[in-house]
């Protein structure tokens, strides 16, 4: 069992990053690969979940042990597979997800990709007791740290702009969409969502 991978971040994609260590490149599927764009070419460490299918052996990577643990708990929910778990963690911070489960907020959970009312209710039923003892401050991701809501919005905006810069967009192009993305980040949109919105705005010119 591989518990974590530490090495040089060789490159990243919309679904995964590749970490090279010992002459081997490990492909790690992540909730939001672009959060690691600032580490490209540098040493980094991700905690992993090893998933075996009939047709593939896959590694999933997470910034913290707590995020990985939450992913594994999501996999215990009937109807949620690895892709669904990643989509949920990409759309919300662990803090937001745990709070939604603890507060039995079905409306919030149904905003996640592929999550209907029945699945949202199942998430609450299956995870509420398992998340007793989890506190928001204990499960924040590395990107969020112990930041206030305002600081988290700024952090998400900066990471999204960094990712768009890495994709080849100029400062002038990004300046035109900065205010729009800033407002979206203040509304609670995460890094991946901001990147997608930014790309849509840039393609429209």
Curated annotation (Swiss-Prot):
What terms describe the molecular function in GO for this protein?
ATP binding; four-way junction DNA binding; four-way junction helicase activity
Q: Where is the stretch described as Domain I?
A: 1-63
Keywords in alphabetical order, please: Cytoplasm, DNA damage, DNA recombination, DNA repair, DNA-binding
Source superkingdom: Bacteria
- The annotated region (Flexible linker) lies at 143-153
InterPro entries per UniProt: DNA_helicase_Holl-junc_RuvA_I, Hlx-hairpin-Hlx_DNA-bd_motif, NA-bd_OB-fold, RuvA, RuvA_2-like, RuvA_C, RuvA_C_sf
Region annotation (Domain III) maps to: 153-205
Q: Where is this region: Domain II?
A: 64-142
User: Where does the UniProt annotation locate this protein?
Assistant: Cytoplasm
In the UniProt entry, what is the domain comment? Has three domains with a flexible linker between the domains II and III and assumes an 'L' shape. Domain III is highly mobile and contacts RuvB.
- What is said about its interaction partners and assembly? Homotetramer. Forms an RuvA(8)-RuvB(12)-Holliday junction (HJ) complex. HJ DNA is sandwiched between 2 RuvA tetramers; dsDNA enters through RuvA and exits via RuvB. An RuvB hexamer assembles on each DNA strand where it exits the tetramer. Each RuvB hexamer is contacted by two RuvA subunits (via domain III) on 2 adjacent RuvB subunits; this complex drives branch migration. In the full resolvosome a probable DNA-RuvA(4)-RuvB(12)-RuvC(2) complex forms which resolves the HJ.
Name the record gives this protein: Holliday junction branch migration complex subunit RuvA
Q: Which gene encodes it?
A: ruvA
